[in-house]
């Protein structure tokens, strides 16, 4: 193992959203902004919510339509456009890009996939556990985030945590806040 003095520090963003699904701003602008200040990025579309609640509640129809409409756009050409642009911006040794996407889950908590292969397919799943099973044997991290969200409402369910090659880390800090402690300097925002 190299000594600490031989190691280099790299800066990146492994979970950046844009308007390809339901984030803000143009996808190309997201890559350009990252390229101007970071060493690596994964612009991350929202891909699925297998256990989306509220199907029987007419008051939540707009929420369901908002999410499922974005997932449909991703599957109807958006993902191919996303993969192509991710490959376009990847410059080995200069600026690295990763194909990734996010899945929501009420039961397991939200997760983000981060793929080594730049042509990684969008994996359909019925749950986070199903996703992890289908991803076995592939070079992909499936990492939990929103650590500070409430359990049962997309907050991480630690009973589902599996250490190993698929989940070598968890997201502790994002624009939602610092999830290390409920006493952190930056309170958690659930928007």
State what each model feature region is:
Residues 1-191:
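Extended, charged catalytic domains and RNA/DNA-binding interfaces, predominantly
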């Amino acid at each position: 193992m190299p000594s600490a003095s031989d190691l280099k520090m790299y800066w990146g963003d492994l979970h950046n959203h844009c308007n390809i699904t339901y984030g803000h701003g143009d996808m190309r602008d997201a890559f350009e902004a990252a390229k101007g200040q970071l060493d690596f990025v994964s612009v991350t579309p929202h891909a699925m919510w297998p256990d989306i609640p509220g199907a029987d509640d007419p008051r939540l129809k707009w929420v369901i339509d908002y999410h499922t409409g974005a997932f449909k756009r991703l599957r109807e050409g958006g993902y191919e456009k996303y993969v192509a642009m991710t490959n376009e911006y990847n410059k080995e040794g200069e600026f690295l890009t990763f194909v990734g996407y996010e899945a929501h889950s009420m039961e397991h908590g939200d997760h983000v996939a981060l793929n080594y292969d730049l042509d990684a397919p969008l994996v359909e799943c019925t749950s986070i556990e199903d996703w992890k099973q289908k991803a076995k044997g592939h070079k992909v991290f499936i990492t939990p985030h929103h650590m500070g969200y409430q359990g049962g409402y997309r907050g991480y369910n630690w009973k589902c945590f599996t250490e190993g090659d698929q989940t070598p880390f968890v997201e502790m800090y994002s624009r939602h806040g610092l999830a290390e402690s409920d006493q952190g300097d930056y309170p958690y925002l659930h928007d």
